[in-house]
Amino acid sequence: MNTCFLVLDYHVLNGRAEQTALIYDSPVTGKKKSYTYKQLTNEVARTAGMLAEMGVVKGDRVIIYMPMIPEAVMAMLACARLGAVHSVVFGGFAANELAIRIEDAEPKVIMAASCGIEVKKIIPYLPMVNKAIKDSRWKPEKVVVYQREECPAELNSNPGVDGRDVDWSQQLAKSNPHDCVPVDACDPLYVLYTSGTTGKPKGVVREHGGHAVAMKYSMSVIYNAKPGEVYWAASDVGWVVGHSYIVYAPLIHGCTTILYEGKPVRTPDPAAFWRVCQEHDVNILFSAPTAFRAIKKEDPEGELIKQYPMPALRTIFMAGERLDPPTLQWVEEKTKRPVVDHWWQTETGWAISGNPLGLEEFPLKPGSSTMPTPGFDVQVLDETGSPVAANEQGFIVIQLPLPPGCLATVWRNHDRFQSGYLTQFPGYYVSGDGGYIDEDGYLFVMGRIDDVINVAGHRLSTGEMEEILGGHNDVAECAVIGAHDALKGQIPYGFVVLKDGHYSVDGNIEKELLQKVREEIGAVASFRNVMIVNRLPKTRSGKVLRR
């Protein structure tokens, strides 16, 4: 088998060659472009040929550090075509986070863009790639750079890297198309790093076969999507939603997918989502609750929604963080469309629970992600591993075996896979979330039970932030907690105790700490609050009390 064949070649051979596969819509650059299945297949085949000519073969790792542009999708699918293992790193991560992933994945090649483009801001990528490689013990053989006209990068400008950097477009022009390489169903398709409780990100390994089955099944059962329809997951390819529901699932299912380089607001206004839905005849929209809270904040009466009838839009799905009932009710009231909450994780790759519209639609219960998806035996246990009664909170677990598509292991660290997910309650996968199941079988997910917080749908480790704060010369002790935020769901809040005789003058230490977290994790952490305190609250055993 080959996942790229299922995504592209299969449809070209079975009557969808001229159907639009990918729509690129970039309000930050003003560019739009569409690719048919045939056109996208040709581009991916040539990109695979380019990688093959650099020596990339089945099993090699390729890190992709790119913004939301078509070439990012082409890079992912080109790796799949060759049987190489891609590891996409979110473009908002700083050089330190990229370096950690380079060292763990050991890529033969890094594929990057010259820059990312945010609202009124351009972020050069190559300087971060250069720093990450410098800081990592592993050195890739090549760095392929896609030059964006908004900010071209100077290649091979760093000492000692002569010939390492390759111009993407120039190399592609000389490359020949490459056929799909057969792989086994259990071969790794990709490694995607997610925040772990130890601070060090863990590489979730996804296999070709089970992943393809889960993607196809979920499009029918969860989203009730039909081949040929337009599916838009307003996320980023650097996250699991982007992997599963921008790239793989819609295309495996024969849908048209949208790649949106913009924001829910400020590109140019809170009508951005509605404009895309109207213009591209979107049938199914999927995003995080944070996006809709941002829209609600700037257009509380929903006046801009009225300007876009969106006749094709059938259903709005939300996931990535807890969907608060007021946001759900506001979106349903203003859009006149049903909102479906569903819950899943980077580790599973698809919905653990949701409303299976393609099988049977269940009545809505605000605050609940409805029922466990077929294949997931979801239970709630107490600290001893015993099942709890209905409506009683506990640890949300999944009885083994896990269904197709879930993580097979942690990259090069199977012991961490076992200890992190399978040891606490033998026979069960531990989700890391707490919640309860009511008397009707509805699942309510209430939040994390470890040190991972959810900032605007992005999983981040407070432990990793504490390591950074604790590394400051003036800091004796520190703690980071997740605080409620009306827009982002949670934001990190830091508390530090200074060493005796050390003092902050005009907030200099606080500023240094904020900058240090931004440099090492990135702006995605939204770390903007740190307070110097005399002491931290402790439990009787001497552990920092976080509540």
Predicted regions and their residues:
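Gly/Ser/Thr-rich phosphate-binding loop
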Residues: 255, 283-287, 296-363, 377, ...
